[in-house]
Amino acid sequence: MDESSEDTIAAAEKEAGLRFYLTREPMILALLSAIAVVLFVGVGGLSRVYHAQRESLGNRWFARGVEDLKQQRYEQAVGEFRAALRYSRDNYAYQLNLAQALIGLKRTSEAYAYLINLWEREPENGLVNLELARIAAQKKETEQALRYYHNAIYAAWSDNQEVERGNVRLELIEYLLGIKSQAQAQSELIALAASLGDDSSLHQRVADLFLQAQDYEHALAEYRLTLKSDHRNSAALAGAGLAAFELGRYPLAQGYLEAAVAANPKDSQSRDRLKTVELVVQTDPFRRQIPVDQRNRIVIQAFETAGERLKSCSAAGDSRERASPQTLTEMWTKMKPQITERSLRKNPDLMEASMDLVFAIERKSSTLCGPPTGTDMALLLISKLHEGN
């Protein structure tokens, strides 16, 4: 075989080898790619299994913590929420519940650290703002407490948004009453009352708070709304009676208090208040539609009662009275002979003059000798009722 033939054979063999390699290379690449895909999928699957297991463990610890938190087992709850956070360090719900458990243990500084971090992440979260408000209130940081309470009122709530907002406002009102901020409490109560709906129990609670805020007009209105659907509610009847009493509407108060005592005979406060109201109604000579003779007898009795009050007043009161040019005692003694039924019939203006003196005696005596009782109390209330007339 000559040299050219050998070269030809070698070239053919080389070409055949190259063709074999070229045909096998895609197969090799495809195989390697398939292996890579399988490995990637496998690693991804293992990763998902790993994360799913961690999530499951975290949720399991969290569920235990939630149950212990409900049962006020705060120490166990803290441990369980911390265990849950090991599996999901930034979980919002885990951190929030841990903060609540820490609050239960009075560890407010630790709770605050979690809560302020959560607030920075979600400043519109209602529960976070509420817990921050409570902590600020405990620290007597009034401005901060009010800010967080108002944030919570207008914040987002996951469930029953309107109910939660109403509950926060109620808590804010009780806080304001606790710090003697009556005017602010009244404003919040008026805002709350506008959105109560037909829930009579809520109307009654708001009425009670209006009483505490000394807003008797709104209190009476809320008690009336309560009684529309529950007219035998003894607590609402007593509250309405008290509100009407404070407003000086004694005949109205009498009706409510009579009903309150009938509904609850053990209500001694309403019974005592009713006695005072009855005395006011019976002792007021200025009330309408009473016969002249009866009016005159009431004036005579009131004048005698005021005289007895003067006599029984304390020595300190008497000494102060003697310092004035003309004491109430002297005025009473000088007027006494005129206070007869005959004189009162002949001189109608005498009734007003005598009652002005009676009222002056009762006011001064209450200042010098302490709060009055019985008919003296009734006369003092009547004096306030007709003050300026």
Give a label for each model feature.
Residues D2-R60, G126, Q138, T142, ...:
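Long, contiguous interaction/recruitment modules in multidomain scaffold/adaptor proteins
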Residues R54-D90, N97-Q100, G104, E171-G178:
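Alpha-helical segment of the N-proximal tetratricopeptide repeat
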Residues A83-R86, I116-E120, N151-Y154, I190-A194, ...:
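Conserved structural position within tetratricopeptide repeats
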Residues Y94, V128, Q161-E162, V168, ...:
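TPR alpha-solenoid repeat register
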Residues G104-A113, E141-R147, E174-A183, L247-G255, ...:
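Alpha-helical linker/edge segments of TPR/alpha-solenoid repeat scaffolds
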